Curated annotation (Swiss-Prot):
Interacts with FRA1, GRX3 and GRX4. The keyword Nucleus applies. Belongs to the BolA/IbaG family. The gene is BOL2. This is BolA-like protein 2. It holds the Pfam family BolA. Involved in the regulation of the iron regulon in response to decreased mitochondrial iron-sulfur cluster synthesis. May be involved in mitochondrial organization and biogenesis. Present with 2050 molecules/cell in log phase SD medium. It is found in: Cytoplasm; Nucleus.
Length: 120
């Protein structure tokens, strides 16, 4: 009889553990569900606050408002003398938190002089 009781306690403990894990997963899923999506305006504000001398910013949500795919163009003299990699890193650092929620992200960075040659 003592052996049966110990076995039942083990089963109950396993059930409690599995129930606890399931509950944790549901709470995590619920928390993810209520997060605000990334917006064009939010990305624009983050970039403007992090990168000095911003001349022009174009943020386009390619996911039709879902906040999952963005195309960004940043024009600033801050990029003068910096390689494409360093420019992209500066923008990525500015939107680091938002990048965790985004599925696709494209960024093009130009100086004012380079931008004036592109846009005629």
């Amino acid at each position: 009889m003592t052996g049966e009781r110990i076995e039942k306690v083990k089963i109950n403990d396993e059930f409690a553990k599995s129930h606890f894990l399931t509950t944790q997963w549901r709470e995590t899923k619920r928390q993810r569900h209520y997060k605000m999506p990334v917006t064009e305006q939010g990305l624009r504000e983050r970039i403007e606050s992090a990168i000095p001398q911003v001349y022009h910013i174009i943020v386009t949500d390619l996911s039709y408002g879902c906040g999952q795919s963005f195309d960004i163009v940043v024009v600033s003299d801050f990029f003068q003398g910096k390689s494409k990699l360093m420019r992209s890193r500066a923008v990525n650092k500015a939107v680091k938190e938002e990048l965790q929620e985004i599925h696709a992200f494209s960024c093009k960075c130009y100086t004012e002089e380079e931008w004036s040659k592109i846009v005629v």
